[in-house]
A protein has these predicted regions:
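Short catalytic micro-motifs in class I SAM-dependent methyltransferases
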Residues: 105
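Conserved Class I S-adenosyl-L-methionine
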Residues: 168-246
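A short acidic, Gly/Pro-enriched loop at the edge of an enzyme's catalytic core
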Residues: 91-101
Length: 246
């Protein structure tokens, strides 16, 4: 996980970010991406939100995390986790050492021109690349709270339009240079009830939100009764290691 923002927010990040739906890990397990005796490299493991599930399902996990405070939290993720304090771009990885490489809400920080060939080398023939993330918001579901969020964002000097970075990297970007072959993309829509305080804590973990904006989101949730239902998405891209780059 890149950026000093997350390092400063390590404990808050661990407490505030909602978990990934079970169906994400069930899908990975069913495909043979994770599970007993499967050696997995996790990119940008952060506080271990996904790492704990990988370990719980029997995977042998090596976790990359450059932030010291976040890495310290990773040591509590369970037996079998080796933590490497490094970005993917800087990591020293042996060739053909992993069955799978995974990234949970982390791949958008990676320089793909460096990262994808490095992942390709680190994977065994036929190995998996699984990239997923939670998208905070669902454009198909408009709520009073989400309208307030849009109003907060619209006040920025350079207002953001669409979801942009939330959706990246796309399957096309991951497969563009021929290092990996697309298998499928899966998307799950889900909802979670959050108190105003939880909204404030969550939004303060977003690197593109200021403290004042997060406070405004918390106040909006408070104005709307003190609890809101947030509609989110989880998007998973599954790819296989190509025999050779094109």
């Amino acid at each position: 996980m890149s950026g000093m923002h997350f390092e400063r927010m390590a404990a808050a990040y661990a407490a505030a970010r909602p978990p990934y739906p079970d169906v994400v890990f069930e899908t990975l397990e069913a495909e043979g991406v994770i599970g007993p005796d499967i050696r997995v490299l996790e990119i940008g493991a952060g506080s271990g939100l996904a790492t704990r599930e990988l370990v719980a399902r029997g995977s042998d996990v090596v976790a990359l995390e450059p932030g010291p405070q976040l890495a310290a939290l990773l040591h509590d993720a369970g037996a079998g986790v080796e933590v490497l304090p490094s970005r993917l771009e800087d990591a020293q990885l042996a060739d053909a050492d992993f069955d799978s490489v995974v990234a949970a809400t982390a791949m958008h920080w990676v320089d793909l021109s460096v990262g994808l060939p490095k992942i390709h080398r680190a994977l065994r023939p036929g190995g998996w690349l699984a990239v997923w993330r939670n998208v905070f918001g669902d454009d198909r579901v408009q709520t009073p709270f989400r309208r307030r969020v849009d109003e907060i964002v619209a006040k920025r000097p350079h207002a953001e339009h669409g979801r942009g970075r939330d959706q990246r990297p796309t399957m096309g970007e991951l497969a563009a240079d021929g290092w990996f072959e697309p298998v499928r993309t899966a998307r799950w829509r889900w909802s979670i009830d959050l108190s105003a305080a939880q909204i404030g804590d969550l939004f303060r973990t977003f690197s593109n939100w200021t403290t004042g904006e997060a406070a405004a989101a918390e106040a909006a949730a408070s104005d709307l009764g003190g609890q809101v239902t947030e509609h989110y998405q989880s998007v998973l891209h599954l790819l296989r290691r190509a025999p050779r780059a094109t």
